[in-house]
Amino acid sequence: PLPFGQRIDRDAPVTAQFDGRDLPAFDGDTVASAIVASGQWVVSRSFKYHRPRGPLTFAGHDVNTMVQTPDAPNRLADELPVRDFPITTAQNVSGTLMADRNAIIDWFGRFLPVGFYYKAFFRPLGIWSFWERLIRWAAGLGVANLSITPRYTDKQYLFSDVVVIGGGPAGMSAALAAAEGGARVLLVDEQPCLGGSLTYHRFAIDTTERDQLAHELMAAVQAHKHIRVLSNALCNGWYTDHYLPVIQGNRLFKVRAKSCIVATGTSEQHVVFRNNDVPGVILCSALDRLIYHYGVAPAGGLVVLAGNDQAWLSALTADDAGMAVAAIVDLRRAPDETALSEEAARRGITVHCSATVYTADRDPKTQSLRAVSVRAVTEQGQVGDVIATLDCRVMAMSAGYMPAYQLACQAGAQ
């Protein structure tokens, strides 16, 4: 029930297929959310060693979700609506996704370092031409459909006083401030609806203030006559004299503005440990999106690895959604907010402070997470003995945030 599953319509079921397997889903689901909802975490295989890969961000910020559609390869499954892409397949596999014959390459990984093929296969003289053909055959991910008819595309010119990139709380506030000053504002957001982090991020134990702020800002933006909103739109450049190409569907908007405001938010950072690429290991923000946007609460137990208080809040969200939270493992001695540890204790959630996940264990049958090994942090950069081995199917982690500054950097900002 709401507030979980904001983007799906449970009265509009959709039948999709991934790799020949039926996926029950709802209108509003993405291919990735439907796959995870079906109980499977593996979506793709890594390029070189063919290790199993699963979603990490559920925001289109990682390549783990690349799949093949009938018309194009390398499409991000966490950005593909199942309504528009009912048939998708895995790519870069020999055999099936779950039984990839090329996964044997991973067994010899220690003998295949980065760039080894630039230093080998050159003797005896003339042998390189033979190896080059094999390497080129093995390269690549998906398959290009050369018989596909190119889709219709068009362009439109837009002029605005102020363009705001990003429809989160900062972007909506900036758009409202500019519009109240009399400016014509164009608000561009890559998500299907406004709100940004307000639609999934938990800022406090009590979510009332967040929900109220989200409702007020979105209502004010939609009602303002001087603000035009482009949702599901990507601004992929910022050029001289505030020329901004914005792509929405099959249309390219060539936007000119007097000024531009970038409010693109942040990207969550992962934690480094052994086997942190195992499917089922995700970011805390990805878990929040999965629950709030698509109403998916994966079964099998959850471990949260915390480097900040936000991870604790994600654990509370998962508990609210009915997930079995096995433990919170905090790299610090304690959370900054004592109310969080008190709330976790009240809910009966096990907590390991001054500890870290040292390694993740992969289930050979499901090719996804089975358990994590927890060790005590003894000093800076040092760990002690194993203090717990926790069975889980999902591990969410958060180690801080980095500004999504790519657009500003492309424009020359430093």
Features from the language model and the residues they span:
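Residues forming the flavin
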Residues: 1-414
